[in-house]
Swiss-Prot record:
It comes from the Bacteria. It catalyses: N(pros)-phospho-L-histidyl-[protein](out) + sucrose = sucrose 6(G)-phosphate(in) + L-histidyl-[protein]. Its EC number is 2.7.1.211. It is found in: Cell inner membrane. It comes from Klebsiella pneumoniae. InterPro entries: Glu_permease_IIB, PTrfase_EIIB_Cys, PTS_EIIC, PTS_EIIC_1, PTS_IIB_1, PTS_IIBC_sucr, PTS_maltose/Glc_sub_IIC, PTS_Sugar-Specific_Components. The phosphoenolpyruvate-dependent sugar phosphotransferase system (sugar PTS), a major carbohydrate active transport system, catalyzes the phosphorylation of incoming sugar substrates concomitantly with their translocation across the cell membrane. This system is involved in sucrose transport. This is PTS system sucrose-specific EIIBC component. PROSITE patterns: PTS_EIIB_TYPE_1, PTS_EIIB_TYPE_1_CYS, PTS_EIIC_TYPE_1. GO terms for biological process: phosphoenolpyruvate-dependent sugar phosphotransferase system; trehalose transport. It is a multi-pass membrane protein. The active site is at residue 26. It is an enzyme of class 2 (transferase).
Length: 456
């Protein structure tokens, strides 16, 4: 493959060198921020040798080349375009300026939660293991092994406000360590553990205001709002405090002001917001049942196109941290939608006689089955439209099944086949059946519907 030739072919189709604001790449895609998106010819770009798909998302023109190829194309492209290397964060900053307010909020929440997903996934896997140990009586609950497993599985959720405080402060422009400190205040041992409230809690009289001494372990919205407020306070203090006193006074005043406001006002308000969202969703799922799964499973892939799905991490973490819920009933639905995209894409592989399309569909379908759907959605299914519609129907069918069968997950971040690792042991069989339904429905519809499957 001639990477220099690919780069030379790309430039005029992107509006020329002067239209390239920045270039970066991820594992599979060349990510470009263009001065004027209208100058790019997506259809022509898709016909270039080596290009597996092309789409606009999150303010970027993203061209799919695949693992092991994209880095070589990128190296040749920045030389041909005469631009300097950009990090993914720099490209994302430029792209963010093109996003609408909803997409910016979604991107912000994604940047806050993605770094802490490994901790939540680890805890979720350990919770699943602990559940199996408890269900099958492998180890007595008083045994040291059981106690240590319990400690390891719950740790990330107990200190979740501290983890969120750190990453949120970084995104809001505050000091991450002050953000973590504020998260620590909200989970201080002086406050009754949020999961032990049923046994009773005490209140504190603060100048005539009765403050409930309840901790915020496992919560999301209280610390998000509190750290946003803290970052605003910190930035304003830095403007007025002399440099000589900045190191001492700014952290001191920031923590005491934001800490008091968080405990008295923001924390209770954030808890009410989180509980309200959880209540609405759980009520909808419990009362609408499979109809809710049908709706959510069918619409999820449409939401993915907008990029707003990144904001769901916050809601899912809130469900897991809520003592009255403690499970993620949304992620199994999203997983069905992702599997359906893989099924619809796989059907295109059987239908098409175009060698180039055939070369793209198989890896794209496999990627979707692992929970990464961009290549399948933008590279194949949306390109031919009807496979995307088939995937929506498959996602709806799978979503209806997992909701009706009460399939729950114990973490966030993993969907499709990898999601099996964080599914509750009692739900695993129905999760697999749901994937089979989503895949089969999407595959069958995509295979039987009539549409052109060539690169033209």
């Amino acid at each position: 493959m001639d990477f220099e030739q690919i780069s030379r072919s790309l430039l005029p189709l992107l509006g020329g060198k002067e239209n390239i604001a920045s270039a970066a790449h991820c594992a599979t895609r060349l990510r470009l921020v263009l001065v004027d998106d209208a100058l790019a010819d997506q259809q022509a770009i898709g016909k270039i040798d080596g290009v597996k798909g092309c789409f606009r998302n999150a303010g970027q023109m993203q061209i799919i080349f695949g693992t092991g190829v994209v880095n070589k194309v990128y190296a040749a492209f920045i030389q041909a375009a005469g631009i300097s290397e950009s990090s993914k964060s720099e490209a994302a900053d430029l792209a963010a300026k093109k996003l609408n307010p909803f997409q910016r909020i979604a991107r912000l929440l994604s940047n806050i939660f993605v770094p802490i997903i490994p901790a939540i996934v680890a805890s979720g896997l350990l919770m699943g293991l602990l559940g199996m140990v408890k269900t099958y009586g492998w180890v007595d609950p008083s045994n040291a092994l059981y106690i240590m497993l319990d400690m390891c599985s719950s740790a990330a959720f107990i200190i979740l406000p501290i983890l969120i405080g750190f990453t949120a402060a970084r995104e809001f422009g505050g000091n991450p360590y002050l953000g973590a400190t504020l998260g620590g205040i909200l989970t201080h041992p002086a406050l009754t553990n949020a999961w032990g409230v049923a046994a009773g809690f005490h209140t504190m009289n603060f100048f005539g205001i009765e403050v409930a001494m309840i901790g915020y372990q496992g919560t999301v919205f209280p610390v998000l709002l509190a750290v946003w407020f803290m970052s605003m306070v910190e930035k304003r203090l830095r403007r007025v405090i002399p440099d000589a006193l900045d190191l001492i006074l700014t952290p001191f005043l920031t923590v005491i002001i934001s800490g008091f406001i968080a405990l008295l006002l923001i924390g209770p308000a954030g808890r009410a917001l989180g509980d309200g969202i959880s209540f609405i969703l759980s009520t909808l799922i419990s009362h609408a049942g499979w109809l809710a799964g049908l709706l959510f499973g069918g619409l999820y892939s449409v939401i993915v196109i907008t990029g707003i799905h990144h904001s769901f991490h916050a809601i899912e973490a809130g469900l897991l941290g809520n003592p009255s819920i403690g499970v993620n009933f949304l992620l199994p639905i999203w997983a069905m939608a992702n599997v359906a995209q893989g099924g619809a894409c796989f059907a295109v592989w059987f239908k098409t006689k175009d060698a180039k399309i055939k070369a793209i569909t198989l890896p794209s379908a496999f990627s979707a089955m692992l929970g990464i759907t961009e290549a399948a959605i933008f590279g194949i299914n949306l390109r031919f439209v009807k496979p995307f519609i088939a995937a929506l129907v498959g996602g709806a069918a799978g979503g209806a099944w997992v909701v009706s069968m009460h399939v729950y997950m114990t973490a966030v971040g993993l969907t499709a086949i990898p999601g099996m690792a964080i599914v509750q042991a009692s739900s695993l069989l129905n999760y697999i059946i749901g994937m089979a339904i989503a895949f089969a429905v999407a595959f069958a519809l995509s295979l039987t519907l009539k549409y052109k499957t060539d690169a033209e």
